[in-house]
Amino acid sequence: MARGNLSSAQMGLDLAPVAASVRFLCGVDEAGRGPLAGPVYAAAVVFDPAKPMLRGLADSKVLTASKREALYDKICERALGWHIAFATVEEIDTLNILHASMLAMQRAVQGLAEKGVTPDLVQVDGNRCPQVPFPVEAIVKGDSLVKAISAASILAKVARDRELLTLHEVYPQYGFDAHSGYPTPQHLAALAQFGATPHHRRSFAPVREAIARGLVAF
């Protein structure tokens, strides 16, 4: 496992003694960095060390939608604590998608702490860490290596997909139910035909180009 770029401000503590005494490990992951529309979601999960680990956990991207939905409910039941958060399209356009993703993860951990679950260590998928008031490290490919991160990836993915299904009910012509906002040929064609909705990310090139051509939907 590889640690990301950790500053003293992000850490506050040396991880070596912390890792040796971890009881409550918090896994964190995001969903939705690549889409052209919709918020970016993040989840934080702490499993109860007194309970058997849930089987079937894996990176959400390799699971079917039905499997993710089934695991979502089991994770929520089995976890000691969990929290889902997001950063809005406006925040994505203002901060950029990387910083908005960090903000969503920070909110997920904060929400978990506000529920009374205090992690000894936070492990985040990827190579960068959000600023949180706990020891934190980044784990490259953590969503396939660390069960708590796998669980977080599933919660974030399912929550975001549900949000895009809601958008589909309002804007069925874009096919959000099929691509969840990702830049598929179907989505790009709809963007070119119908224009950008208020839920599209203006800072992303295909959306920016559509707006420049006067293609805006309300």
From Swiss-Prot:
Per UniProt, the cofactor note for this protein states:
Manganese or magnesium. Binds 1 divalent metal ion per monomer in the absence of substrate. May bind a second metal ion after substrate binding.
Gene3D superfamilies referenced in this protein's UniProt entry, alphabetically: Ribonuclease H-like superfamily/Ribonuclease H
Catalyzed reactions: Endonucleolytic cleavage to 5'-phosphomonoester
| Predominant place of localization | cytoplasm
The Gene Ontology biological process annotation of the record reads: DNA replication, removal of RNA primer; mismatch repair
Residue numbers binding a divalent metal cation: D29, E30, D125
Query: Care to name a GO molecular-function term for this sequence?
Result: RNA-DNA hybrid ribonuclease activity
> What EC number(s) has UniProt assigned to this enzyme?
3.1.26.4
Q: If you read the UniProt record, what top EC class would you report for this enzyme, in one word? A: hydrolase
Pfam families hit by this protein: RNase_HII
**Cross-referenced InterPro entries, in alphabetical order?**
RNase_HII, RNase_HII/HIII, RNase_HII/HIII_dom, RNaseH-like_sf, RNaseH_sf
Q: Which residues form the RNase H type-2 domain?
A: 23-216
User: Per its Swiss-Prot or TrEMBL entry, what cofactor is needed?
Assistant: Mn(2+); Mg(2+)
Report the subcellular localization: Cytoplasm
Q: Which GO terms describe its cellular component?
A: cytoplasm; ribonuclease H2 complex
What are the protein's UniProt keywords? Cytoplasm, Endonuclease, Hydrolase, Manganese, Metal-binding, Nuclease
Function according to Swiss-Prot or TrEMBL: Endonuclease that specifically degrades the RNA of RNA-DNA hybrids.
Family affiliation: Belongs to the RNase HII family.
What HAMAP family does its record include? RNase_HII_B
Its recorded name reads: Ribonuclease HII
Native source species: Cupriavidus pinatubonensis (strain JMP 134 / LMG 1197)
Gene for this chain? rnhB
